[in-house]
Amino acid sequence: NSGIHVAVDTCGYTTSSKALEVLKAADLLLFDIKGIDPMRHKKNTGKSNEVILQNLHLLSEMRKPMIIRVPVIPGYNDSDEELNGIADLLSTLKSVERVDILPEHEFGRIKYEQLDLEYRLKPCPVSAERQDAIRVMFEAKGFHTQIGG
């Protein structure tokens, strides 16, 4: 109510009522979707995506403005099948303002090093041509899409 625009960057993985209240109160959500295949999601992240997808649908029903961010991870979610599945999922939502295609990066490496953990992702950049093809794929499904975010 103080005139400050609040944006929250989230992967949507929460069952906390307090965290959900924060998401509901935000003016804009930057919501990361890494994949829709539940088995692959659990194998690669250690967690099911069930809660993530439930929260995504809940916030969509509330017409909460969202920028969906899709980190493209080679060997995990970079297939046409998985990306089309993500786009089809997003087509069911009511408040997607834009889709950001996020090419693979190593920004998380420092966090792992600080926690004395092994950073298991190996550098595998997504070519500019592939990034553009993914952008076109999402735009063909009606989404305003950009590379980067």
Per-region residue spans from a language model:
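Conserved AdoMet/S-adenosylmethionine-binding subsite of the radical SAM
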Residues: N1-F107, E113
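Short aromatic/hydrophobic-glycine micro-motifs
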Residues: I4, L117, F143-H144
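Short glycine/proline- and charge-enriched loop/turn segments
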Residues: E113-L121
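Short, flexible active-site recognition loops that position polar ligands and cofactors
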Residues: R120-R130
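A cross-taxonomic marker for long C-terminal extensions/tails that follow the last structured domain
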Residues: R130-G149
